[in-house]
Amino acid sequence: MRKIVVLFVVAFCLLSTGMRAQHTFVHKQSSTYEWPEDSLVLKKLDQWRDLKFGVIFHWGLYAVPGIVESWALCSEDVDWISRYGHNNYQEFKDWYWNGLSKQFNPTEFEPAQWAEVTKQAGMKYMIFTTKHHDGFCMFDSQYTDFSISRCAFKEHPKADVAKYVFEAFRKEGFMTGAYFSKPDWHNQDYWWDYFATPNRNVNYKIERHPEKWEAFKTYTHNQIGELMSNYGTIDILWLDGGWVSPRNNQDIDMPQIAAMARAKQPGLLVVDRTIHGKYENYQT
């Protein structure tokens, strides 16, 4: 059985590579690179470069219906976003946010098996999705009730899923990373239900409602602080949602986030995905 799982992982990686080649999902690489100045970050980066092969886990509410992460919540007309039988956008959002959290109950969750299988496949570092764009936390955040530890899975002894995932992989010698979505479509200070949600971006004018944006920044900083404080050694902070950036007038203060995170996790690699520069220690 273990050999079958390993073969499945390898096959999935090869299939994913083929899909990317066909649909050009690969993000453009920067022609320049800004080297970190912190000696501890440079040391960690050298260690990471030697690992060569890693795995990223996307796991969340979207696993219940088996859809493409949380992207169906986004009202954008592209081929890879489908609502699978739901014709009404608002009904879909209600079903996703209010229905799936009542169904997501992975009682056979066993992260030690994940770690064992990926180690057998030769992988040496991992990234785990602590929160995707839908805002559903796979860790026990004190700043929202929209999390795995407050929903159908809350009575399980491993309800704080991220904690046990990171522990299992550290035990097998992996470098561990926390994926975290900068946008949060469930948060009223990002997608405010006073307005429609026409696309992936914040749906109000920040210059007209600066207090809401400040509240969202605080929420984001607090949740990242939890991950950096309560989950043992974290080697990589992998930030997704590149449209949340100063170039789009969505500045969440990356200098402060990086400084806070590295104060708690010295040598931390920061990957502000697709935002080339000081806070993209490696590109994906």
What kind of feature is each model-predicted range?
Residues M1-T24:
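Bacterial Sec-dependent N-terminal signal peptides
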Residues Q22-T284:
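Mature catalytic domains of secreted/periplasmic carbohydrate-active enzymes
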